[in-house]
Amino acid sequence: MAIGVTQNTFQLNIVSAEGPLFSGKAHALAISGLDGELGIRPGHSPLLSRIKPGVAYFQTDLKGDDEILYISGGILEVQPSLVTVLADTAMHGKDIDEARANEARRAAEENINKQGNDINFAQAQMDLAKAMAQLRAVELTQKQRRR
């Protein structure tokens, strides 16, 4: 490949502890890194980042909708033509139980608001972030289906 010339896709592999979720060509990936949102396109500079709980979007077709995933955290490795997401947990938005995510959000908020030293505040915040990310993935998937 000549310097300055990039392909229009990269190989994207998304794997969670439960198994592979996606392996194929992608045009773009947006994911929540520890220091902020990351946008990955073909030819991106090498990068290694921790992933925080959030929604990941990736585009496999320039004309189609984004694929939407909930990612609970993990590691992102980027090479110019290969991107690997090693997720602790990952789910397609359509596979998330909205009622369970709402209950997890409510329980986390309740734990944060409790007075006393018997709660782990950092863990409660992490639980809340995960529940909110799941609900966001559900919301975005539902909006996409309505179009």
Swiss-Prot record:
Q: GO molecular-function annotation terms?
A: ATP binding; proton-transporting ATP synthase activity, rotational mechanism
Family matches, as InterPro entries: ATP_F1_dsu/esu_C_sf, ATP_synth_F1_dsu/esu, ATP_synth_F1_dsu/esu_N, ATP_synth_F1_esu_C, ATPsynth_dsu/esu_N
Enumerate the Pfam families for this protein.
Answer: ATP-synt_DE (PF00401), ATP-synt_DE_N (PF02823)
Q: Does the keyword 4Fe-4S apply?
A: no
Q: How does it sit in the membrane?
A: Peripheral membrane protein
What subunit structure does UniProt give? F-type ATPases have 2 components, CF(1) - the catalytic core - and CF(0) - the membrane proton channel. CF(1) has five subunits: alpha(3), beta(3), gamma(1), delta(1), epsilon(1). CF(0) has three main subunits: a, b and c.
Protein task:
Produces ATP from ADP in the presence of a proton gradient across the membrane.
Question: Record's family?
Answer: Belongs to the ATPase epsilon chain family.
Write down what this protein is called: ATP synthase epsilon chain 2
Question: What species does this protein belong to?
Answer: Photobacterium profundum (strain SS9)
Read off the lineage from the record.
Answer: Bacteria, Pseudomonadati, Pseudomonadota, Gammaproteobacteria, Vibrionales
